Structures are given as structure tokens and as C-alpha cells.
Amino acid sequence: MSPYSILFVVVIALCLLPESIVGVCWDTGCQLNAWAVRGCAQYGMRDVNMKSCSGGIIYTCCD
């Protein structure tokens, strides 16, 4: 297999893999419903998932 073929396969694989595998993602702590600022925007990231916690939400943030 030529180096260009390998590079092509790697690029295609990176395009098809979920962002949680390729990008940087992490969960916040439990952000209480009473807080004025919640979510991932305050970190310059996107909300990709939310899970309920005691009195609030845990956000999964990805860049």
C-alpha cells in the first residue's frame, strides 16, 4: 500500500469517527439549576450531551 493510500484511509477514518473519540470532550460537574450560567459555552465549547444530577445537569462539552 502506498503512503498516499494510507494517508487517504487515515483522513477518511478521522472524518467518520465520532467527535468524542477525535476531539477533546469532558463532563462538567453537576451545574445546579439555580446557577445563572450553565452549559459549555462559558468554556468556548459545545454541549453534546446532558445528564440529570441532583438539582441540576452534567454537561458533556466538546471543542
UniProtKB/Swiss-Prot annotation:
Originating species: Pristhesancus plagipennis
Top-level taxonomic group: Eukaryota
Cited function: Toxin with insecticidal activity. High doses of recombinant toxin causes impaired motor behavior of D.melanogaster, which progress slowly to paralysis and death after several hours.
Identification of the protein by name: Venom peptide U-reduvitoxin-Pp19
Lineage, broadest ranks: Eukaryota, Metazoa, Ecdysozoa, Arthropoda, Hexapoda
Residue spans crossing the bilayer: none
Annotated localization: Secreted
Keyword Cell cycle: no
N-terminal signal peptide: 1-23
